[in-house]
Amino acid sequence: MTLGLVESSRNAAFAVAAHAPVLGLILLGSIVAYVGTLRYIPNVARTLLDRNIFGIDINKSTEEQRQKFAAKRRAGQTEEKEFQKQAIPESLGILVGAMYLSVVVVLTVCLRFLGAAGEGLDNPYASLPGPLMTITVMLLLGFVDDVLDVKWRHKIILTALGSLPLIMTYDGSLSVLMPCAFGRFGLSTMNVMKEWRLGLAAPQGEPTTTFRATAPSTWFSFTVNHRSYVKVTESGAALIYLGPVYLVYLSMLCIFCTNSINILAGVNGVEVGQSIVIAVASVVYNLFQMRLDRQLTPDFSSLDAAAADARDMTSDHQLRALLLLGPFIGVSLALWRYNRYPARVFVGDSYTYFAGTVLAVSSITGVYSKTLLLFFAPQVFNFLISLPQLFSIVPCPRHRVPTWNPRTNLLSNSHNYTILNVILYLFGDMHEAKLTWAILKCQVIACVLGFVVRYVLSAFLYDEVR
């Protein structure tokens, strides 16, 4: 295993070196995104305050203090000094998203027309307008939510509609490779049919279904109207064509990622921090996967082109994902400097929607959506324990954040069903900054375990792990 890891790392390094011009341009764009966001945050923050788009830090004030401030604000009795002390600019995600989209669009133009991406519409970046449109729609939806406070049922519908541009331009495989145990079960139960062909006659005009023995590399195939829906190889691996069902899965992935970042929030820096950790893990994954540049899996060499594309992780997929992830890390790092404890700006729903969409879109573009779900393990856990409140089985307040104790300046368990309160329940009261770092440590551990599952434990389910 050690020798294999060394060899894979060497191949990844060679692949990165081969694509150094493109990766260098992406890195340059990421630096520009970081510097530009850092430069404009103070100006945009003042503009948002002037437009009365601000919030009060719940974890640094009591309910009585917030009500008193709101009453003074309505009566026009708030002094400027008091206002500047209490009010924190909100929805800075709109600036971050705008800077990100500007940089990515410029990078796409440069890569397409300066020779790095090839010529014509067949270059790997020609399909990016769809993903970028989805990111734009989600960003604007988040800003609308900041201003109008959209209800949850409407959020689900709108995020589903926002994922349509991505789904319409998706050019990847619609097949799923199942573990070997799945195929071996079929082999053991249907072994008596190995040397036979079974033709099922159908009325004229109806689809014809055939079970056929094929080439040695593909032991069993289930075909309807020349479309292979199930293929099982001699090794036992099964490739199942899902078609439109897979597109529904991708849409649901966008909905989940967008809202999961949004509900794991409430303390300074946690939204941006978790997004940065997942994005960095995704970058590492894509760089490592570049070692497979134009390598085909022998067991599936005879399958159709769509199946081959699913197993042939060419660098085109990774470069597109890195193009989306690099500038995102840049703008998020700049926002982190202002949003970490003590927060000088709030990111708002515009950032959480934007961040979740970028991570989902990059995984779909880079063909690693299942691996992304491993990185999202804390968000999945937080979502599962939140279900009783999200479905109103138990009372659900508007803000499910921990309770702030003004005497100790610590956060305590508010008995809401979130991972933040689980940590406080297990380890006791914490300072807000310490709680944020505890969440980020959990996120790092989840990403490391995700790599272990992806490259080590999956070997027990698949004959070949790439």
Swiss-Prot record:
Keywords: Endoplasmic reticulum, Glycoprotein, Glycosyltransferase, Magnesium, Membrane, Metal-binding, Transferase, Transmembrane, Transmembrane helix. It is a multi-pass membrane protein. It is an enzyme of class 2 (transferase). Glycans are attached at residues 59, 416. Its EC number is 2.7.8.15. It comes from the Eukaryota. GO terms for molecular function: glycosyltransferase activity; metal ion binding; UDP-N-acetylglucosamine-dolichyl-phosphate N-acetylglucosaminephosphotransferase activity. Inhibited by natural nucleoside antibiotic tunicamycin, which acts as a structural analog and competitor of UDP-GlcNAc. Belongs to the glycosyltransferase 4 family. In Leishmania sp., tunicamycin-resistant variants are associated with increased levels of NAGT gene transcription due to gene amplification. This is UDP-N-acetylglucosamine--dolichyl-phosphate N-acetylglucosaminephosphotransferase. It comes from Leishmania amazonensis. The lineage of its organism: Eukaryota, Discoba, Euglenozoa, Kinetoplastea, Metakinetoplastina.
